[in-house]
């Protein structure tokens, strides 16, 4: 009896040890894949992005701009009319001149990755993407936004319930202090923070920021400087997860 019990305990211990090793191995693999994705995005950011042919299913349904202080914030509503979630699609913004020539404003090779690419957008959903250009549009120019069809990095969407908590206070007119909290086990690289305000259906202020690394279970603060003036309008601020695998 004793020898049988010892064998049973030994077998159970082996199973637990194997399960622990498997969990550790899986966790290590997940971490490695996330780092590989971040590296792929960093490499893609070093290439110029110019979308010339629009995606027929994932489209920019609204393109608004807010100008002030020598800058222009693009606030783009993107709708995913396809049957699948999508992520890492290229997006180009700029303006068209009266003669029809397009000027691209986010085609540089020194931008953060998500200043020329979209975070995840799920099937049938719409989301807002914000980009700030260090230039005001010339008179008569018409803003445009084009979403591409081919993802720039091989991201997976297997952890779709990731949510980043945030609180914010306006420390002075046009300046917002934001506190971020990642309560999940999924670290966020190049996390996107978007802020925008509307009045009577028109955007009157906007800003965006990239948080390079918000680790699992960690907190971080940042300051946003708005383009335009919110002037008491309701300011909406979103922290958009970029690692969902």
Task: List the model feature ranges, each with a label.
Residues 2-4, 10, 14-177, 181-190, ...:
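Membrane engagement elements in two modes
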């Amino acid at each position: 009896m004793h020898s049988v019990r010892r064998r049973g305990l030994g077998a159970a211990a082996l199973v637990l040890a194997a399960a622990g090793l498997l969990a550790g191995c899986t966790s290590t693999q997940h971490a490695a894949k996330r780092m590989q994705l971040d590296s792929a995005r960093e490499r893609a950011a070093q290439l110029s992005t110019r979308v010339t042919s629009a995606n027929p299913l994932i489209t920019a349904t609204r393109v608004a701009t807010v100008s002030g202080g020598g800058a222009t914030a693009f606030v783009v509503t993107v709708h995913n009319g396809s049957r699948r979630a999508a992520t890492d699609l290229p997006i180009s913004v700029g303006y068209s001149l009266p003669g029809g020539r397009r000027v691209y404003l986010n085609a540089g090779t020194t931008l953060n990755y998500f200043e020329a690419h979209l975070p995840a957008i799920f099937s049938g959903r719409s989301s807002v993407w914000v980009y700030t250009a260090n230039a005001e549009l010339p008179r008569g120019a018409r803003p445009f936004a084009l979403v591409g069809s081919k993802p720039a990095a091989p991201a997976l969407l297997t952890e779709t319930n990731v949510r980043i908590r945030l609180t914010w206070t306006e420390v002075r007119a046009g300046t917002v202090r934001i506190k971020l909290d990642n309560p999940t086990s999924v670290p966020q690289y190049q996390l996107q923070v978007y802020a925008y305000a509307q009045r009577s259906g028109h955007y009157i202020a906007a800003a965006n920021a990239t948080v390079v690394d918000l680790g699992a279970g960690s907190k971080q603060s940042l300051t946003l400087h708005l383009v335009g003036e919110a002037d008491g309008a309701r300011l909406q601020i979103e922290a958009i997860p970029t690692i969902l695998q």
